[in-house]
Amino acid sequence: PCFLAGVSAATAFSLSRALPLIELTHQQGHISAALFAASGADLFGKEELVFHVSGGTTDLLHCKGPDSITCIGTSSDLYAGQAVDRLGVRLGYAFPAGIYVSQLAAACTENIKPKVSVRGTTCSLSGLQNQCEKLLAEGKSPEYVSKYCLLCVAETLRRMAAAALERNPGLPVVFAGGVMSSEIVRDYITKRMQYAYFVPGKFASDNAIGVSILVAREINAWPNTSM
């Protein structure tokens, strides 16, 4: 319903100003913002794998730029952002709690081996919430459990990417979405994967810049103009 309200407002504005209405999807905007942040105009029109990881998605997408998008992997239950936020709330922080979980995790210096559930490009994250609860019950510190949670997310994505790259060797992998702003996730993956691109939070948290790029491209104003 929130997206339909936006369509109605855009339609009314375009009619009142005699302007063309360019319809795009929410996910196209996020992918466009991610590709732009990762490599400017270079990845547009090329094949790549894109992770969109947030409180509402843990999707692995096979893209040919933002115009051709195929979902080739996802979670069978809980999304990564949900697992992180639920841990943060469990530790007493306000929702959304991802930033607090990241701060706690950064303070943990212990070596941790994550345990994950991945089959091919499909993951299950419901067990992660139970694992975090068990660790807290065993007396592990909030810092330890937060780091464990984020490393589980990172290892899950790494394994999904590895499975996808077996079928699509050599493709770059772009990681976008709020959860990907975690330095722990970024460091873990980049040390274990080549051609991994991470999107800065300012481009990942809102897809407005991606929508703007797509509209500019539609009217041939980008990448011909500086941005």
Per-range role (PLM):
Residues P1-T11, L15:
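Short beta-strand-loop/turn "lid" adjacent to the catalytic site in phosphate-handling enzymes
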Residues E23-L24, V173, T190-V211:
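Conserved phosphate-binding/catalytic loops in two-lobed NTP-binding clefts
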Residues H30-A33, V199-M227:
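Glycine-rich phosphate-binding/hydrolytic loop that grips phosphoryl groups
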Residues S102-V173, V179-Y197, A216-S226:
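A contiguous, well-structured pocket-lining segment that forms one wall/lid of small-molecule binding clefts
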Residues C2, E48-H52, V174:
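Short glycine-aspartate micro-motif
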Residues F44-K46, F51-S54, D59-K140, I219-M227:
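A short helix-loop
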Residues L24-L49, I213-L214:
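Conserved phosphate-binding catalytic cores of ATP/NTP-utilizing and phosphoryl-transfer enzymes
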Residues G56, G177-V179, G201:
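Active-site metal-binding loops of divalent metal-dependent hydrolases
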